[in-house]
Regions:
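N-terminal signal peptide c-region/cleavage motif recognized by signal peptidases
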Residues: 13-15
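An extracellular/secretory-lumen and virion-surface interaction module
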Residues: 19-177
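Sec-dependent signal peptide recognition
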Residues: 1-9
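Absolute protein N-terminus
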Residues: 1, 18-19
Length: 177
């Protein structure tokens, strides 16, 4: 029966499975953002995934295909604006409510992403980006614009990204049990 402790040790050492998704946001005036996030597989069918559940996250800002900046969860500090909600069933970031819905290194004033820096914000005023500590007003699109995530790689042009559709074509069904 010495096999059981070895089996438990091996299972404990095995990495937990994670859901990895990519997303692409297309703002106004040639601005876009690509991103990647991971969260535990056990939350694949949860009602909501929040910033507290995310195990890896990174975003890169672009304008007309030129890189503007980058932010990742590894740079999270006590003063970083960090608010995220994601619906893993619909594979979309909810953009409803009052106030700020998403704050990825950019709070409500969209000017706290650092210099150099990049951040994204979505709230009642719209969806927009922060570049080098500056609110880029010309990037703003309507707050209710859907933002989806999927398993397909994305490009700064958001080509093929499931962004503005009523259904999400890239939802990966759970593996058969």
């Amino acid at each position: 029966m010495r096999l059981w402790p070895a089996l438990f040790a091996a299972l404990a050492a095995a990495p937990a499975q994670a859901v990895e998704l990519q997303f692409c946001w297309r703002g106004a005036a040639g601005y876009s953002m690509t991103g990647l996030m991971r969260f535990p597989d056990a939350l694949r069918d949860a009602a909501l995934v929040t910033q507290d559940d995310i195990t890896a996250f990174e975003i890169t800002g672009w304008r007309h295909g030129e890189r503007l900046g980058h932010w990742s969860l590894e740079a999270l500090g006590p003063d970083t604006s960090w608010l995220l909600s994601f619906d893993p069933i619909a594979m979309r970031f909810p953009m409803t409510g009052i106030g700020v819905f998403q704050a990825w290194n950019a709070g409500g004033a969209v000017d706290d992403c650092g210099a150099p820096g990049f951040g994204f914000n979505a709230g009642n005023g719209g969806q927009d980006v922060c570049v080098d500590g500056r609110f880029v007003t010309e990037s703003t699109i309507p707050w209710e614009t859907p933002l989806y995530a999927g398993t397909t790689p994305v490009t700064p042009a958001c080509d093929g990204a499931p962004m503005l559709s009523g259904t999400h074509p890239l939802r990966t069904p759970p593996a058969p049990t």
